[in-house]
Amino acid sequence: MEVLEEKPKEGKVKLKVETLDDLWHLYHVISPGDIVYAKTLRKQAQRSDSLRPEKVEAIPVFLGVRAEKINLHRFANQLRVTGPIVYASRDDVPLGKYHTIAVEPGMTITIQKERWRSHHVERIKEAVEASKRAKVMIVAMEDGEAEVAIVREYGLDFIASIRHNIGGKRYNVKREDEEKKFFHDVAKTIKDLIERENVQKVIVAGPGFYKENFYGFLRENYPELAGKVVLDDTSMGGRVGVYEVIKRGTVDKVYTETRVAQEIKLVEKVIERIAKDEPVAYGLKDVEEAVNYGAVDTLLVLDELLKGDDRERIEEIMEMARNLRANVVVVSSEHEGGDKLKALGGIAAILRFKIH
């Protein structure tokens, strides 16, 4: 994401949307009541002569829509913002009618808010910083099976599962042929994703020597891919192996700590503190009390809460925590750390001292 222009007095920020991750960030920035401006297509009936029916055409127009519904359609690579039109660049587009702006990578949009909360500003900054970081792919493989995932800002995006039935004993000619076909399939998948997603590093993980054999195959047949590969040991392949790579911190070693890895670590720290009866709070009531005491070191808030009925109350707690110099982290509901935080009420805090 790129910030093109800011107009603080008008509450406007103009942005260049670049990736699917940007759409996810914007989903958590745009709130009901905000106005989103963008070039879009709107179906308009064109008058014809009386003998012919009206012709409906999609005309290009610059619109401002007051957001009522905000939906992220990840598989379509779209963020759809629906609401009444409050501004139109053409006089023949009636104000007040409903329209959906489909925000996609490559588009330029402007967001206007009556009040920009600090967590909205932080989210924009994170998106800009994230666009500068290397994108990482994880391939967890074991004996004819490979799970391929990309580490995104919101969590793990499982892209492909590759499976070949590799039978027979080791060093059997037929088995070696099947294994080579499997390796070719995995390599081609990696190559396609590197080109499509602009991936800079590939972590190949798994138990035993299987990953080393694959790496040797890459060096011989796909040397340009081998240069992007980092090997890691995991107890299993498949999805379990992918999650193990995240927990082991291997992604962090490839580049600065990812948002996903950081969030999972913090949630695990909360759970560990609960088990050891160390300073911690969870659940809305207890966390709010801890913030009022000035006891919070790190506040964790599940992103879903910022779309729910308690949104304003949660935002006030976040503002107060920041004013008291607490670290505030919005945790994605798209990974296992988010699931665990949800089980704790969606909000928790690592405390500087006990309050009870």
Swiss-Prot record:
SUPFAM superfamilies: Dom34/Pelota N-terminal domain-like (SSF159065), L30e-like (SSF55315), Translational machinery components (SSF53137). One of its GO terms (biological process) is nonfunctional rRNA decay. Its cofactor is a divalent metal cation. It is found in: Cytoplasm. Belongs to the eukaryotic release factor 1 family. Pelota subfamily. The N-terminal domain has the RNA-binding Sm fold. It harbors the endoribonuclease activity. PANTHER family: PELOTA, PROTEIN PELOTA HOMOLOG. Monomer. This is Protein pelota homolog. The lineage of its organism: Archaea, Methanobacteriati, Methanobacteriota, Thermococci, Thermococcales.
